[in-house]
Amino acid sequence: MDKDVQEITDSKQQLTEAAFSNHTPMMQQYLRIKAEHPETLVFYRMGDFYELFFEDAEKAARLLDLTLTQRGASAGTPIKMAGVPHHAVEQYLAKLVKFGESAAICEQIGDPATSKGPVERKVVRVVTPGTLTDAALLSDKSDVFLLALCVGHNKRGVASTIGLAWLNLASGALRLAEIAPDQLGAALERIRPAEILAADGAIEAVPAGTGAITRVPAWHFDIASGTQRLCDQLEVASLDGFGAQALTSANGAAGALLIYAAATQGQQLRHVRSLKVENESEYIGLDPSTRRNLELTETLRGTESPTLYSLLDTCCTAMGSRLLRHWLHHPPRASVAAQARHQAIGALLDAPVHVGLDSLRSALRQIADVERITGRLALLSARPRDLSSLRDTFAALPALRERVAEIAPNAAALGRLEAALEPPPGCLDLLTRAIAPEPAAMVRDGGVIARGYDAELDELRDISENCGQFLIDLETRERARTGIPNLRVEYNKVHGFYIEVTRGQTDKVPDDYRRRQTLKNAERYITPELKTFEDKALSAQERALARERALYDSVLQALLPHIEGCQRVASGLAELDLLAAFAERARTLDWVAPEFIDEIGIEIDQGRHPVVEAQVEQFIANDCALNSDRKLLLITGPNMGGKSTFMRQTALIALMAYVGSYVPAKAARFGPIDRIFTRIGAADDLAGGRSTFMVEMTEAAAILNDATPQSLVLMDEIGRGTSTFDGLALAWAIARHLLSHNRCYTLFATHYFELTQLPAEFPQAANVHLSAVEHGHGIVFLHAVEEGPANQSYGLQVAQLAGVPAPVIRAARKHLAHLEQQSAAQATPQLDLFAAQPIVDEQECNQPPAAAPHPALERLLALDPDDLKPRDALDLLYELRALARSGATDAQR
């Protein structure tokens, strides 16, 4: 904080007049405002610029690459300054928000012409990372959440529950949840708040890197006050109708959140009209590891594409894209919602051409972002082009509703959406009459209110716009009336409007002419008519802008009662757009509607990984069958063979089915699924002081503790990072526990071939492998899942493909042969990594390997053409081509 601010504030931000005595009046005003926002950058309006002073200026100059200047002094201290043009402030605010900073926008609210001393100023809004509503500060396709966190304690003073309340201020969507303390990390990973509000005692509970943290006084989280504040906000006597009356810490969090959000906007939150209480049992559980490993909305490298979201997002509106992101992270457990969505997709695909999918999507492309426009409307910050876009959208809704109405009889969900697309009564008429067809970007620029809406404004505009013509007409009339042929009617900024007559013609001047200025060769006059026009003309533009501002404000006020209706339309448009996008993906990518069954089971016929399939020329489809008699698949095969792809595609297809999308398969059937777990990949946690193996075991522990018979578990290469015997023992024990205790659907990929003996002990386990064909010392991956275990991992061949030098590969091959001989002699599973091994002579390693027959030739010799079906023959051609290419590559080496 600036030392000047510190001088004038105590710990409770109480100001003392003595602290201001040595400062100029303007700096006194600034310092008082800054004292109210000590942790926030204050943008102080001065004419056409926003200025920042002292340490704020230094910080802004560093973050925004501004020029830091020093002008004058106050109280003997040089005033450091940095500024940005007022018309470009949004782009600078956007940069600050990305840095996690907040900014208080301090505007001039007084009239400079009438002010004595500094013009009156006040902070009209505070821009923080979690309270963004302006289009320039928001990403079109993702939401920004402000979250408040309240820790509840039991009688012993131990944290027993955490209440969460999070708000999307741009749309007004408010949600509450109460969770156990150990679930906080997963909840924050799912919500991904941009800003977290917490009292001092609760900040320690927030995991690092989960959003900007803002300290809020503890009394803001009072549960009783929060409950009452929620009732006041929603205009209800009780929260029973929302299922929130019995909540405690969540209501306390909501109270703090509403206080903070309203304070940043400087007004009430009119668009926060409902809330939703989220329960863990409502959605399929996805922990942070699963969301990351399945690459739902972000790749493992941190990019937005290629992901499931980027593949599915062909939405025509930003609202649909944001809803897609929400659906992917909130798949409902109950299949009813998904079945309704599947039915709607089918109806869209089967619709007649004139009202079909392409026609519907073409109409949706003309739709504006009604959701965010409504949010700005409720906060009275909507701009003219927001209202014109809202008008044009409402005008397009009748035709859109007609298209949906023709399809709706075949899908109940579409019937519900058709009803939601009716504009609030009177809104379209008001917007059509009041807003110009193509308004200016800002009200201050004029040209926003339509002609014919207000007679006074039309007159002021006519005066301002027709000034030149009036002067020409007056000059013509006065020449005729006075008989002075060279009489001129003109204007200058010093004397205003005047009639100029040369010295030789002054005797013809009428009596109603009043002398305004005497020149050497002429006299300048004013008449009552010209004076009246001058009074109107000189103030017409200013008065027109003021009148337009007042009319615009009245239009905003007139639209406020229709906020809920606009939100209903926005919700309907978003869902319709997303269902249409799902239908387009199903048609384009040849996806099918999945089925839901009551029995335990996952059956996927010819399933494909949706994202990988879009990236490769040819994708090999595979089946997956899990049921009460087949609960665990032990997956073996070479690295690069497709084990992880097969596992991920199974989880993604299941997730897509419950989200409500069609799926990439020939057919798919799913029983109940309550959670999806993944233990895939290797990564350490340096910040948390955890090794790769520790991270792996932590994730495995969570699965073993929480998985149920309705959970889908993906386990990939469990047991790495320690000695062979330790890893094998852990993998064996974990697989047994999943079978005997959790009894969940499990895909268990491993290179421990000893585990393939597990089905002998547990009939619910089965072996499958990813096929590959070995050619000499090379390998061709076929990516086909086949029954039974693999016979080896082909690790050396994969290393060769990766570019490991040939001498190293040959040395490894010699050493492998020795290990295999030793293993056979000792009849042990696999040797401990830390056991001493004999060294192979390096000269032997440099000897070239013996030539091997071409793999394509071997494959051809082994097949029986009479047994081939047409589809098998086609698959064989692709296989032979792959073998031929591999052989050519090996020959080049």
From Swiss-Prot:
ATP binds at residues 637-644. It holds the Pfam family MutS_II. It comes from the Bacteria. Keywords: ATP-binding, DNA damage, DNA repair, DNA-binding, Nucleotide-binding. GO terms for biological process: mismatch repair. One of its GO terms (cellular component) is cytosol. SUPFAM superfamilies: DNA repair protein MutS, domain I, DNA repair protein MutS, domain II, DNA repair protein MutS, domain III, P-loop containing nucleoside triphosphate hydrolases. One of its GO terms (molecular function) is damaged DNA binding. PANTHER family: DNA MISMATCH REPAIR PROTEIN MSH1, MITOCHONDRIAL, DNA MISMATCH REPAIR PROTEIN MUTS FAMILY MEMBER. Belongs to the DNA mismatch repair MutS family. This protein is involved in the repair of mismatches in DNA. It is possible that it carries out the mismatch recognition step. This protein has a weak ATPase activity. NCBIfam families: mutS1, PRK05399.1. This is DNA mismatch repair protein MutS. It comes from Burkholderia thailandensis (strain ATCC 700388 / DSM 13276 / CCUG 48851 / CIP 106301 / E264). The gene is mutS.
